[in-house]
Amino acid sequence: MTNGNGATPEAAPPPQLNVLAQYIKDLSFENPNAPQSLAPQGQPPQINIQINVGANALAETEYEVTLTIEGKAESGSQVMFSFELVYGGVFRLVNVPQEHLSPMLLIECPRLLFPFAREIVANSVRDGGFPPLMLDPVDFVSLYRQNMERQAAAQGVQGRPS
């Protein structure tokens, strides 16, 4: 196929995603009841995990994406351990249409960061005297949708007259 002057139209360049850096931005592990918490317990602790994703622009095509993972293990009323990890990455996104930018930053980039963050959590918990905590894979698509629904609901509440 040619355009009016006989030249073939150039295809749009494909989107590019590059990881420029990965790093621990914040890491905290607490074992407040050691050494008693390290003794064998009657039943496994209840472990609650919270995961959040954020992104902000650094330059025209560079973005920082942060993956925050917080967790707490409790046995009855006793806290066995708690942790917080903020793991960051700097990404370059080129030729990404504006409508795809948010999903790339909040789904694809965290998906690339997660295995490294998971290993840091497992090692931190192990180094705290407990068996390594192997986090289950995260469905970042569902997390993205939940956050979008929450934002839409919050905007709906703000937009309503009192």
From Swiss-Prot:
Function: One of the proteins required for the normal export of preproteins out of the cell cytoplasm. It is a molecular chaperone that binds to a subset of precursor proteins, maintaining them in a translocation-competent state. It also specifically binds to its receptor SecA.
PANTHER family, A to Z: PROTEIN-EXPORT PROTEIN SECB, PTHR36918
Source organism of this protein record: Bradyrhizobium sp. (strain ORS 278)
InterPro entries per UniProt: SecB, SecB-like_sf
Entry's localization field: Cytoplasm
Keywords in alphabetical order: Chaperone, Cytoplasm, Protein transport, Translocation, Transport
Any matching Pfam family: SecB
Descriptive protein name: Protein-export protein SecB
Cellular component, GO annotation: cytoplasm
Annotated GO MF terms: unfolded protein binding
Assembly information from the UniProt record: Homotetramer, a dimer of dimers. One homotetramer interacts with 1 SecA dimer.
Xref: Gene3D superfamilies: SecB-like
GO biological process, one term: protein tetramerization
Family: Belongs to the SecB family.
